[in-house]
Swiss-Prot record:
One cellular component term from this protein's GO annotations in UniProt: ribonucleoprotein complex
Protein name: Large ribosomal subunit protein bL28
Gene3D superfamilies in the cross-refs: Ribosomal protein L28/L24 (2.30.170.40)
Species this protein is from: Prosthecochloris aestuarii (strain DSM 271 / SK 413)
GO BP of this protein: translation
Length: 72
């Protein structure tokens, strides 16, 4: 499965790890993704989604209305 948040669209980024000796190594920075079961009240069903930690905060504040739009 791809490592992309369904709500925010966050995906892996690429950059450098820099050591104390200033050696650069390429690194892949992964988003903080979690697989969650979310209850959609409008549709009366559970949906399994991959969301980032930021998306979990958004859903706790605003509810799952934005998520319901994606699954209609």
């Amino acid at each position: 499965m791809s490592k992309v948040c369904v709500l925010t669209g966050k995906r892996p980024k690429y950059g450098n790890t820099v050591s104390h000796a200033n050696n650069h190594r390429r690194k892949r920075f992964e988003p903080n993704l979690h697989t969650k079961r979310v209850w959609l009240e409008e549709e009366k069903r559970w949906v399994k989604v991959k969301v980032s930690a930021k998306a979990l905060k958004i859903m706790s504040r605003q509810g799952t209305a934005e998520l319901a739009k994606l699954f209609k």
